[in-house]
Design a protein with these regions (language model features):
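Membrane-embedded alpha-helical bundles that constitute the cytochrome b-like, heme-associated redox core
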Residues: 1-183
């Protein structure tokens, strides 16, 4: 089988893996600018609405990332093309797992930070999530800095991930991107 035939026959991700990937991706791409907007908005109903939206999406992401991690651990990703150099394989693995870890930690830090403030964690106006930390304003302030830096890290690593996917599609012309798009 030629390399081109092998690339064309390479298996794609399952429909569930693709759904989880793209749902998390869209929410993360919404959260990055949303986080920066609310950090630079000064009071008023718009800021409160955006904070509540941010918290609701964060809670949703926490649940989806846990589901995604469990699914990934029980349904491994298809192998990368065999001609990808070892350093790129390592970079892909490190980038994926860094994103998983940060996307799991970030909403937890936000949840603890908000609980320690203390402020409610509304879920799309339906109900408030329970506080998970006692009031501690000093901790909340420190965690807000941690939350910021994790958010920046997620944005940088997501940009690397997107760049790598586009590199595979437009430069290498392999199926790495398409197997997450269409299987």
């Amino acid at each position: 089988m030629s390399d081109m035939t092998a690339a064309a026959a390479a298996p794609g991700h399952t429909p569930i893996a693709r759904l989880l990937h793209w749902t998390v991706a869209v929410l993360v791409l919404l959260m990055i600018p949303l986080g920066f907007v609310i950090a630079n908005e000064w009071g008023g109903p718009a800021q409160q609405f955006l904070y509540n939206l941010h918290k609701s999406i964060g809670a949703t992401l926490l649940l989806l990332v846990v589901i995604r991690l469990v699914y990934r651990l029980t349904h491994p990703a298809p192998p990368l093309p065999s001609d990808i150099p070892a350093v790129q394989r390592f970079a892909a693995l490190a980038t994926h797992w860094a994103l998983y870890v940060l996307l799991l930690i970030q909403p937890l830090v936000g949840y603890i930070m908000t609980s320690a403030y203390p402020a409610p964690v509304p879920f799309f106006g339906l109900f408030n999530l329970p506080a998970i930390w006692p009031e501690d304003r000093a901790l909340s302030e420190r965690l807000s800095v941690v939350h910021l830096y994790i958010g920046i890290s997620i944005a940088v690593i997501a940009a690397m991930h997107i760049s790598a996917a586009l590199y595979h599609h437009f430069v290498r012309k392999d199926r790495v991107l398409m197997r997450m798009v269409s299987g």
